């Protein structure tokens, strides 16, 4: 394997993922300002914030498959060109419908995740795949970049002009990928239908998808709802709330490679059991939190577990599904993205019914318990699957 080429592609694709996630998550940190200019209800805000997750999740399957057919270079390049249009539309938005339409197509920025996790393992030996995928996953930091930088920039030049700056980011990364992307990346041409049939027959596909639904779903959901939630429930300023949300995202992102390293060294399923146990504890803390300190402790606990858990799950995907890695990555990452779609809606609904959001966090704990049951079942049903 060409180590220098692998290092270059890991760097370029990780930075490209940063750019994609910056765009994918741009609406959430700017929503407090957007809602001042566009008349929008609380329920509509939840929908607008969740909409980018839909396309960003569903497209991960074809993006993973296309990566094996034409290579990461052209999937990334095409995605960045496409994203120019919804970014411009968002900068011109004057109604809720325009926000929804722009947000839907911004989902392309989230879909590029499955490109790298399909491409990167081709450049590294098996005992380094977990670490390599973990480093690539740090591209999730793009969400934190938007959370940290977008609110103060918008405070200075307005949210519309801030969004237009992202046009420059996309153009730059399209050029970078055009010149530095690997046109000679190894291709895997197995019919999509055949790959999908095999995966749908494998219990591990469903279990990995469920685990990632929780770990990555938590990462996405907290990144989406925290800025507005902290402003509404704890009366923080928009900038302060954005910084705190960014810290949550940054911790989860930087710990993702640690999950990959742990998965390279010990059995990843065993490590996931411990990880989910602590996530359950964090969710329970959030469910009973009545002050900012306790809420912060709960958020930080979930952040740590989400980051490590993300790395552990994507250590297992190429380990279990070598020939079907592209589609498997797409399916699992799609479910992770969808895991971020429902929580903001659930929190809004539960709060409207009960007057508090506490019960919504208890749902996260219950999902964690179900995940532990599936891990136990996987090991009991056939230990060779868990230690393959």
Curated annotation (Swiss-Prot):
GO terms for cellular component: plasma membrane. InterPro entries: MFS, MFS_dom, MFS_trans_sf, NO3_transporter. Induction: Positively regulated by the two-component system NreB/NreC. Coiled coil: none annotated. It is a multi-pass membrane protein. The keyword Zinc-finger does not apply. The chain crosses the membrane at residues 14-34, 45-65, 69-89, 98-118, 139-159, 161-181, 206-226, 242-262, 276-296, 297-317, 330-350, 359-379. Keywords: Cell membrane, Membrane, Nitrate assimilation, Transmembrane, Transmembrane helix, Transport. GO terms for molecular function: nitrate transmembrane transporter activity. One of its GO terms (biological process) is nitrate assimilation. It comes from the Bacteria. The keyword Cytoplasm does not apply. Its main location: membrane. It is found in: Cell membrane. PANTHER family: HIGH-AFFINITY NITRATE TRANSPORTER 2.3 (PTHR23515). Probably required for nitrate uptake under anoxic conditions. Also possibly involved in excretion of nitrite produced by the dissimilatory reduction of nitrate. Belongs to the major facilitator superfamily. Nitrate/nitrite porter (TC 2.A.1.8) family. This is Probable nitrate transporter NarT.
């Amino acid at each position: 394997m060409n180590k220098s080429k692998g290092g270059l592609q890991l760097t370029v694709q990780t930075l490209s993922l940063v750019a994609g996630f910056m765009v994918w998550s741009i609406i959430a940190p700017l929503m407090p300002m957007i809602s001042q200019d566009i008349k929008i209800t609380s329920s509509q805000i939840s929908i607008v914030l969740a909409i980018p997750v839909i396309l960003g999740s569903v497209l991960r399957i074809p993006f993973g498959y296309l990566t094996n057919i034409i290579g990461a270079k052209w999937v990334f390049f095409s995605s960045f060109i496409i994203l120019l249009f919804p970014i411009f539309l968002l900068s011109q938005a004057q109604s809720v419908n325009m926000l929804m339409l722009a947000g839907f197509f911004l989902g392309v920025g989230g879909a590029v995740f499955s490109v790298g996790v399909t491409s990167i393992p081709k450049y590294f030996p098996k005992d380094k795949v977990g670490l390599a995928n973990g480093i690539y996953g740090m591209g999730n930091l793009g969400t934190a970049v938007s959370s940290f930088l977008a609110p103060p920039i918008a405070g200075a030049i307005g949210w519309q002009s801030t969004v237009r700056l992202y046009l420059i980011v996309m153009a730059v990364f399209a050029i970078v990928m055009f010149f530095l992307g690997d046109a000679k990346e190894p291709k895997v041409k197995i019919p999509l239908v055949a790959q999908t049939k095999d995966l749908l027959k494998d219990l591990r596909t469903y279990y990995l998808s469920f685990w990632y639904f929780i770990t990555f779903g938590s990462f996405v959901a907290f990144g989406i709802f925290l800025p507005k939630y902290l402003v509404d429930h704890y009366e923080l300023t928009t900038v302060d709330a954005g910084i705190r949300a960014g810290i949550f995202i940054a911790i989860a992102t930087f710990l993702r490679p640690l999950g990959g390293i742990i998965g390279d060294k010990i059995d990843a399923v065993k490590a996931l059991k411990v990880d989910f146990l602590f996530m359950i504890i964090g969710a329970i803390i959030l469910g009973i939190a009545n002050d900012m300190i306790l809420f912060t402790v709960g958020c930080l606990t979930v952040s740590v577990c989400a980051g490590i858990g993300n790395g552990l799950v994507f250590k297992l995907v190429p380990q279990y599904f070598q020939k079907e890695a592209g589609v498997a990555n797409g399916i699992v990452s799609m479910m992770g993205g969808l895991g971020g779609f429902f929580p903001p809606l659930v929190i809004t609904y539960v709060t409207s019914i009960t007057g508090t959001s506490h019960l919504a966090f208890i749902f996260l704990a219950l999902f964690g318990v179900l995940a532990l049951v599936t891990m136990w079942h996987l090991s009991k049903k056939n230990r060779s699957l868990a230690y393959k």
